[in-house]
Amino acid sequence: MLTGCFTESFQDVIDMSENGISPFGMRAICDFSQSGILNDLLPLDILLEILIFANKFCCERLKEACDRKLASLISSRQDAVDLMECALEENSPVLAASCLQFFLRDLPDCLQDEQVVRIFATANKRQRVIMAGNGCFSLYCLLSEVAMDSNPRSEAAASFLEKLVECAVSNKQKQLAFHLLGCVRLLRKEYDDAEHLFDAAVAAGHVYSVAGLARVSCLKGHKLSSYEKLSNVISSYAPLGWMYLERSLYCDGDRKWEDLDKASELDPTLLYPYMFRASFLMRKQSAEAAILEINRILGFKLALECLELRFCFYLALEDYRASLRDLQAILTLSPDHRMFDGRVACTQLRRLVKEHVETWTTADCWLQLYERWSAVDDIGSLSVIYQMLDEPDAAKGILYFRQSLLLLRLNCPRPAMRSLQLARQHAASEQDRLVYEGWILYDTGHCEEGLRQAEESISIQRSFEAFFLKAYALADSSPDPSCSATVISLLEDALRCPSDRLRKGQALNNLGSVYVDCEKLDLAADCYTSALKVQHTRAHQGLARVHFLKNNRKSAYEEMTKLIEKARNNASAYEKRSEYCDRELTKGDLEMVTRLDPLRVYPYRYRAAVLMDGHKEKEAIAELTRAIAFKADLHLLHLRAAFHEHIGMWLVLFGTAGLPSLLIPTTRRCLSSKTE
C-alpha cells in the first residue's frame, strides 16, 4: 500500500502481508508514531521487522530508536554476529557500532570464531564505513595486529591486511599496509606476492621495506643482490641500526662482525646482534662470555628470544636451576609459549628440567622471593612466584598480584594486566577482589573509579592493600598539596594492617617520599631506615635524597653506592647517584647507565645539555639524534627542537623510530651460520 497509489485505502480490509511487517509490528510502529518511544518489551524478531520497515520507508527517527533498542539487547557473541549482519544489510551504523564494540571487547578470543572473521574479512567498502565510519584503517590495523600476534601465517591475518590495503588512503597508510602484508606473504612463502608488496611500499616511500626485498632476493638465491640493496640504502640515507643488521645477514667473517657491531652502536635495542655474538662465543666454549653478552640485552629488555637462548646456554652447562628460572620467566610472559620454532611446549621442557632440580618447600620459596626482591632481581622473583603458583594450596590472588607488580616494573604491561585479571579471578574474598579491580581501573587510567573500589573494600574490611591502593590513587588523582596529610594517614593505616615485609617496605618507602614532599626530612629518614630493616633495598634511594636535601652530598653518594652494590638491576641507581657527585663522576655514572640500559633518556639529555653549554651545538644535537633513532622520546624531541631553534634552524625533524619491524625471524638459521 505504502509504495503504491493508495487505492487500498478505499477498501474495508487492507492486505499488509506484502510489506514484510506483522500486525504486531505495525501496532508497535503506530504506538511509536504517537509516543515517540518503542515499547521495552518488544521481542527481537519484531524489532528486526521494524528496523527493516523503517529502513525501507525512510523513517529515520523510528530507525534510530530501533537501532538503539537492538544495540541494548546484545548479550552474546552470537547475538553480535546476527545483529551485525542485519546492521550491515540495513545500513544501521548505531547497531553496527554496538556489535563492533562487543567484538573488540572480546579480542583476541572472538577471532577464533569463523563467523566473526568472515564478517571482517568479507566486508566491502560500504559495510566497513557502516561499521567504523572514518576509522576503518585504524580498525583493520588493530584486527591485523591481533591476528598476527596469534599467528602471522593465518588466513585471518592475510585477509585483514588485504582489507587494510583497501582502507589505506594517505601515503603513510599505504606504506604500512603494503609492508605488513608483504611480511605476511613472505612468512607464508608467497615470495612473488611479497616482492610485489615490498616494491609498492618502497615506491610509497617506506625505506625499511628494502629489507623485505633483500630477504626475498636471498630466498630466491641472489644473496649478493640482497647485500647490494642494503649497501645502497646505507649510502643513500642517514645510517640506522636496522640497515647494518639486515646487511649482516648477507655477508660473513669480519664484514659480518663489523656490521653487527655497528648495528648495536646505532641501535642498542636490536636483539639479533647480541644473540649472534653470544651464540658464537658459546660455540667457542666461552660460556661465561656468552652469558654476559646475552645478559647485556636482558638487563633492559625482557625478550622471549633472549631468555630462550640463555636457557639453552644454562642447559648446555647443566645449570638446571638457572635453566628452570628462565623457563619460568618465559612462561610468566607467555603461558602457551613453544620453543625451538614451535616444536616443543615450554611446559613440557619445564617438567623435564624440574626432575634435575631440588624441590623447594613453600617456606623456601618465600625466603627465595625475599632474597631476590631485596636484590632487585626481577627475573628471579618472577620465576619464584611462578613456582609458588604451581602449588595446589597457593594463595593465587596475592601471588598473581605480586607478579603483576614485577611485570610492570619490567615494562611488560600486557602480561601485567593479565596477571591482575587472574588475581581478581582468584581473589580469596570480596574485599580482595575489589582491590584488584581497583588496580585494574587505576592502571587503565580510571583513577577515580579505582579510588571508589578501594573505599568499598575498606568498608567491608580494613586491609593493607585497600589502604595502600587508596593512598596511591588519591596521591595521583588530587593535585592539591593539602591531600598529603590524607595520604600519610592512609599509609599509616596500611602499615597497621597485617602484611608481609615486601609490601610493608613499599609502604614505608612511599610514606618517606610523601614526607620528603612535605619537607619533613627527619620523619622521611625514619621511614626509609625502617624500610631498609625489612630489606626494601630501594629505600637507599630515598635516604640518599634526604641526605642531599640536608646538604650532605657525600652521604647521598655513599647511600646510592650501597644500592648499586646490592641491586642486580642497577641502571636507575647509577642514574640517581650521578646527581650527587661532581661533573667527571657524573659523566662516568651516566655512561654506565647508557651501557646498562640505553633506553633511559636522562643521560642523553644531560650530555647534550653539557655540550650545548660548551657551545658545541652540532655535537649536542647529534647526541640527541643518536637516541631518537631508536627511542622517539617526547622530552628528547622537545629538547632537540629547542636546540635547533636556539641556533636558528627551523626544521621539521622526522626520525624512523616506531617503524614496524619485519615479521621474519633473524635467530635460528642466522645464528647457526659459521663465522670465518
Regions found by a protein language model. Name each.
Residues 169-172, 204-206, 235-239, 268, ...:
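Short coil turns that delineate tetratricopeptide repeat
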Residues 177, 209-211, 243, 273, ...:
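TPR alpha-solenoid repeat register
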Residues 157, 194, 226, 256, ...:
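Single-residue signature of alpha-solenoid repeat helices
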Residues 42-48, 61-160:
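Alpha-helical protein-protein interaction/assembly modules
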Residues 145, 183, 215, 249, ...:
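Residue-level recognition of tetratricopeptide repeat
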Residues 1-75:
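Canonical BTB/POZ domain core
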Residues 150-151, 188, 220, 250, ...:
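Structural motif corresponding to the intra-repeat A-B loop/turn of tetratricopeptide repeats
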Residues 161, 198, 230, 260, ...:
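Hydrophobic/aromatic packing residues within the alpha-helices of TPR/SEL1-like helical repeat arrays
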